UniProtKB/Swiss-Prot annotation:
Its EC number is 1.3.3.4. This is Protoporphyrinogen oxidase, mitochondrial. SUPFAM superfamilies: FAD-linked reductases, C-terminal domain (SSF54373), FAD/NAD(P)-binding domain (SSF51905). The gene is PPXII. Keywords: FAD, Flavoprotein, Heme biosynthesis, Mitochondrion, Oxidoreductase, Porphyrin biosynthesis. Induction: Oscillating expression during diurnal growth. Maximal expression in the dark period.
Length: 504
């Protein structure tokens, strides 16, 4: 029997392999599929979602990876709307109430620059330096501004002083990527601000001019409603946790399209006589199959961490393609510790998002990077009689501490929460997950990593790289990276299809 028109169209569609089922890979697969391409996602682990992991247990709901995201990327809006997740979007209560530990005590962080200047959070000298920054740095010569290897701490200290670095920048980078301002490259960690200095000298003046420029208004599109503006500014999660996002994409993929426990062993790029483009052959292995399996594809999106990519065998037109040009990537280790305390045992419960701990606060006995007030943000995450906290330990600040045992981590977290929130006694519940490679560290020599990714893409036709090794570490950036790679694949396949028709 001849296949139906729909079946024939499906079988004749180009095939694309996506390696890795984290948020980047799943976003790429979703966009490719709605474009009509055949997609196969290979995931070495037994579950999809990457570092978006939500757990529901004994009336508690917590995230072991990212806890929130923002809608600053257009691709995030596209996916949420396409997947019908608006009704499941969950915004934290009092998310503008964020605290910074200072002298061993949590201090409410002013929610905007004007309130910061009016408050006592910073010294008079630091506030004066902030006020004078637009004047002192206006039209500075290029020789006096940041070079591509300058650290985050060096950049912000030049503009705003050491106190701002110690009590604003340091806790911020620790809380967002587990890094520290001395190890991070300004060029790669905050490219927008780095470019503003190049253009305007003053970061504050540049930010104001950039926001008010007609080009920026045009880029932002038509006027947004207040609800849309709130969505784009604020952090959010989903009912059930962040994994709700990746689960929704997985539901759209058939079992043969999402291959869990399927490890890619070899990739081979070759050009056949009857094809005008390079095709890809992928050999993968699964525990439930005795023999490895070989399949052909028209393009590949690679989202695996570079440390895993280096272990793959890749051939190009019959010859080994060595990946020895990929440098060693420095990764940040992190432990995520979940605790609950009876409400009556927390003497100073703070309403808000959470508290961050600057490095300097270690002199006051604080060892954690920060704590999210999970059940304060999302009351449905815990029963009414307990508080649920998510605490982060380790990072580049203290790599060894990230690897500590659960018993030691419990003592560290309990001690910090006692000092910061007045939590007394033992927690009623403790859990933790150790991420040995939580984030790639955008360090001073990260150019070599980006150059290696570019070289890999340039020398392997039809292969595109996506993920948080390039373009940003946030969930939104990683998701957008996957969507962008999908767009590049679509353009690539359309261009080679046009070229092949010209040769007919």
């Amino acid at each position: 029997m001849a296949p139906s028109a729909g079946e024939d169209k499906h079988s004749s569609a180009k095939r694309v392999a996506v390696i890795g089922a984290g948020v980047s890979g799943l976003a790429a697969a979703y966009k490719l599929k709605i474009h009509g391409l055949n997609v196969t996602v290979f995931e070495a682990e037994g579950k999809a979602g990457g570092k978006l992991r939500s757990v529901s247990q004994d009336g508690l709901i917590w995230d072991e990876g990212a806890n929130t995201m923002t809608e600053s990327e257009g691709d995030v809006t596209f996916l949420i709307d396409s997947l019908g997740l608006r009704e499941k979007q969950q915004f934290p209560l009092s998310q503008n109430k964020r605290y910074i530990a200072r002298n061993g005590t949590p201090v409410l962080l002013p929610s905007n620059p004007i309130d910061l200047i009016k408050s006592n959070f910073l010294s008079t000298g630091s506030k004066l330096q902030m006020l004078l920054e637009p004047i002192l740095w206006k039209n500075k010569k290029l020789s006096q501004v940041s070079d591509s290897h300058e650290s985050v701490s060096g950049f912000f200290q030049r503009h705003f002083g050491k106190e701002v670095v110690d009590y604003l920048i340091d806790p911020f980078v620790a809380g967002t990527c587990g890094g520290d301002p001395d190890s991070l490259s300004m060029h790669h960690s905050f490219p927008e601000l780095w470019n503003l200095e190049k253009r305007f000298g003053s970061v504050i003046l540049g930010a104001i001019r950039s926001k008010l420029s007609p080009k920026n208004e045009k880029k932002q599109g038509p006027p947004k409603t207040s609800a849309n503006k709130k969505r784009q500014r604020g952090s959010f999660s989903f009912l059930g946790g962040m994994q709700t996002l990746t689960d929704a994409i997985c539901k759209d993929l058939r079992e043969d399209e999402l291959r869990l426990n399927s490890r890619v062993l070899e990739l081979s790029c070759s050009c056949t006589e009857d094809s005008a483009i390079d095709s890809w052959s992928i050999i993968s292995a699964s525990p439930h199959k005795r023999q490895s399996e070989e399949e052909s594809f028209d393009a590949v999106i690679m989202t695996a961490p570079l440390c895993d990519v280096k272990s793959m065998k890749i051939a190009k037109r019959g010859n080994p393609f060595l990946l020895n040009f990929i440098p060693e990537v420095d990764y940040v280790p992190l432990s995520v510790v979940i605790t609950t305390f009876k409400r009556e045992n927390v003497k100073y419960p703070l309403e808000g998002f959470g508290v961050l701990v600057p490095s300097k606060e270690q002199q006051h006995g604080l060892k954690t990077l920060g704590t999210l007030f999970s059940s304060m943000m999302f009351p449905d995450r815990a029963p009414n009689n307990v508080y649920l906290y998510t605490t982060f330990v380790g990072g580049s600040r203290n790599r060894e501490l990230a690897k500590a045992s659960r018993t030691e981590l419990k003592e560290i977290v309990t001690s910090d929460l006692k000092q910061l929130l007045g939590a007394e006694g033992e927690p009623t519940y403790v859990n933790h997950l150790y991420w040995s490679k939580a984030f790639p560290l955008y360090g001073h020599n990260y150019d070599s990593v980006l150059d290696a990714i570019d070289k890999m893409e340039k020398n392997l036709p039809g292969l595109f790289y996506a993920g948080n090794h390039r373009g940003g570490l946030s969930v939104g950036k990683a998701l957008s990276s996957g969507c962008n790679a999908a767009d590049l694949v679509i353009s690539y396949l359309e261009s080679v299809s046009t070229d092949s028709k010209r040769h007919c």
